[in-house]
Amino acid sequence: MRVLFIHQNIPGQFRHVIAALCADVRSGVWAIVGADAAARARVLLPRLNLVSYTAPAASAGTHPWLADVDAQVRRGQVVAQALQQLKDKDIGFDVIVAHPGWGEAMFVKDVFPSTPLLTYFEFFYSSTGADVGFDPEFPTGPESAQRLRVRNMPHLAALNACDAGFTPTRWQHSRLPTEYRGRVAVVHEGVDTDAVRPDPAARFEWQGRVFEAGQPIVTYVARNLEPYRGIHVFLRALPALLSAAPGIQVIVVGGDEVSYGQPAPHPQGWRAWLTEELANAGTPLDAERVHVVGKLPHAQYVKVLQVSAVHVYLTYPFVLSWSMLEAMAAGALVIGSATAPVQEVIVDGENGRLVDFFDRDALVSTIVDALRHPARGRALREAARATVVQRYDLKRCVPATLKLIRALAGQRSS
């Protein structure tokens, strides 16, 4: 079976399924990837046959709402050229798997019309019921709904072109247009619960300090520290938390760029803006107790989860972070926001705790209660890991994805 993956940052969400196919000597696995990610992909997956492309520059004078669409069309054209070059060499595929978010899947069917296309749908935008308009501190303008219609254009094209699709969670599936949901399966990428597991002897070292499992450590993780992941709620809650729990240490993992939403009002990012706000209010963060460690290598990041007594995960109604599931797999007691993506996984009082996203007082009191009663939280930790093992383990998710791929390959050969 020959499978082609298309993703500008290969392996991305396809890492584990690509690895499984590469390990199967009966499979030939190819990928089209952005040039910036090609070197890393070669190291991670040496058996992968790579075709890289350089993303073209955006054109000047494009309507601002169309800037992303313009870039996606241009990227789609470059990928189509790469596909045509493969086709001209008589290289064909049983299935093509693509992420449409950057436009790369836009013209796949024009080059390989009879090859089944399996598309990964990460998020379909809407002006109601999800991230947009959720946070009153950062209101959206009256043109927001119109901009989102334009932003969804490539996703609608992908939904129309694909033979089948998959998306990680039921909530993300529910955001898709009703008429397309029947061809999209719910299959998560999966969590390596053998690598991410509880370790009562775990130690995390940072700038001469040693943090150990069993200590009163509160952790927070996001790719980037921004409102979409509740950094404004968390940092503003810290002065009260540090006062209520004098013995705790706080570890914050994440960068200062913006992954989602609007740019920060401070040139150094949202964290700098919030830190300055707290200092001006007379409640500066104690650098001896709050440790912002930036982005970490994966092994170090796992150590942070393993030493955590309480892990805080806050998110707008948006794509669920891998970090929340990995925190649960590591046996952390997760206190999450009572937003739909989190509620799909965590049931308050059964495998974690939930608080209103905006309620800082509830967040503080729930953290303090968890720290004061560690024995009570033990059952929640065990149930959290069991949830991830039962529903999101690689051993379950990768075979489910391979089943989708093989079913489409079978349709082509039948």
Tell me the role of every PLM-derived stretch.
Residues 1-51:
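N-terminal subdomain of nucleotide-sugar transferases
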Residues 207-229, 235-240, 250-251:
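Conserved donor-binding/catalytic core segment of Leloir-type glycosyltransferases
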Residues 258, 262-295, 299:
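Nucleotide-activated donor-binding/catalytic signature segment of Leloir-type glycosyltransferases, i.e.
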Residues 348-349, 353-360, 369-375:
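Conserved acidic donor-binding segment of nucleotide-sugar-dependent glycosyltransferases
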Residues 362, 369, 376-391, 397-403:
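A short, well-ordered alpha-helix in the C-terminal region of glycosyltransferases
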